[in-house]
């Protein structure tokens, strides 16, 4: 019996050594985010951001900004009210941050395209530039843009440098936004910072 136990222990130790060697083998691909934890954002927290948007008349809010090794990933919640026609200089474009929208509620018309007319640099002091989506431009129109009718459940992918322009919002639209920031131009935001943000009035651009 003792011999069997010793053999089993030796096998276990050998297996552990083999696994460790496999992990540190320099010829193997290595994780781009070594020993990074996973992250969870509950629905209740996302709903708190939507409630805050309605109460304080906010549009875009950053819920998290997470380090994943070679990039930052931002999670935002956006609420937009009714829009009969687009405002002047309302095309948006971000130089380094790509965005993915998942529509939660409402309907709207969104135009996408890279050819933006009358580009104007967004101020570097702007809150969204500093904390949400980094440097970029606004513009008047998107030349040869493609329009999409958005509804709940839809997903939109907007690469960095692509113009995006809400031209009509029927009543309102709420969506969750994932921001991909490979150059890490936006600051990190954790759960504790999110709770602190939700506990008091939101900062605004001066």
Predicted features by range, described:
Residues 140-145:
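Short alpha-helix capping/helix-loop boundary micro-motifs
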Residues 7-16:
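Bacterial N-terminal signal peptides
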Residues 19-95, 188-196, 200-206:
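A short, N-terminal "cap"/entry segment at the start of jelly-roll beta-barrel domains
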Residues 95-114, 125-138:
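Short, conserved beta-strand element in jelly-roll/cupin
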Residues 92, 98-102, 147-148, 155-156:
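His/acidic/aromatic-lined binding-pocket segments of jelly-roll/cupin-type domains
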Residues 171-187:
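A short hydrophobic beta-strand segment most commonly corresponding to one strand
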Residues 1-4:
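Positively charged n-region of N-terminal signal peptides that target proteins for export
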Residues 148-169:
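Conserved metal-binding segment of the jelly-roll/cupin
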